[in-house]
């Protein structure tokens, strides 16, 4: 009786470990794909000659209401389509010129610093989880340099795409793919 019980216990434990390992692999693969998709979203801005020209003209003439409306509309569509909770457009000095958001909190010093770093590096960066110093909320951020011309060149500014992990990421992590 004891040997039979121990054998069943070992088999059950092995089966549970196998299922947990499969779930972990599935979650890691899905999270990796999600991150790649977010970085692909940033390609809408990165080395996009049309966007670079529009941003450059806006930085040169920020009082042009028509240009501001076009740019704000364009960024708003990106925000809505890809479910970012905030998009910020920075000029080459790191000053925020346009914020498309559902929130009004000020930009954190870490955000301003990261925008400058991305412009200096000339390549996009996926920033880790950050707690907002003003609201205490946690966000992920993607920073994208706006380069002068499609093949690179001088940085004209940067775009920050802010992700609220409560929208997709946290619910996904908590979801269990098999009956428990």
Predicted feature descriptions by range:
Residues 1-63, 76, 80-85, 138-140:
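Juxtamembrane extracytoplasmic/periplasmic/luminal helical "stalk" adjacent to the first N-terminal
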Residues 37-45, 76-96, 123-124, 174-180:
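Short N-terminal helix-loop-first-beta-strand/juxtamembrane motif that initiates sensory/input modules
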Residues 45, 53-55, 94-102:
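Amphipathic coiled-coil signal-relay and dimerization helices
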Residues 66-83, 102-114, 131, 147-180:
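Solvent-exposed, extracytoplasmic
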Residues 120-128:
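PAS/PAS-like sensory domains
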């Amino acid at each position: 009786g004891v040997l039979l019980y121990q054998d069943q216990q070992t088999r059950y434990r092995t089966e549970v470990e196998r299922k947990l390992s499969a779930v972990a692999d599935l979650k890691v693969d899905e999270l990796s794909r999600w991150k790649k998709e977010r970085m692909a979203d940033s390609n809408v801005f990165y080395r996009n000659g049309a966007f670079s020209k529009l941003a450059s003209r806006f930085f040169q003439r920020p009082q042009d209401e028509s240009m501001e409306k076009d740019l704000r509309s364009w960024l708003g569509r990106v925000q809505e389509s890809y479910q970012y909770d905030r998009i910020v457009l920075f000029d080459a000095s790191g000053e925020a010129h346009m914020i498309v958001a559902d929130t009004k909190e000020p930009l954190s010093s870490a955000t301003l610093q990261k925008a400058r770093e991305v412009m200096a590096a000339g390549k996009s960066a996926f920033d880790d989880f950050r707690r907002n110093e003003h609201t205490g909320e946690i966000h992920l951020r993607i920073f994208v340099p706006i380069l002068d011309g499609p093949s690179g060149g001088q940085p004209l500014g940067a775009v920050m795409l802010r992700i609220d992990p409560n929208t997709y990421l946290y619910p996904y992590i908590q979801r269990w793919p098999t009956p428990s």
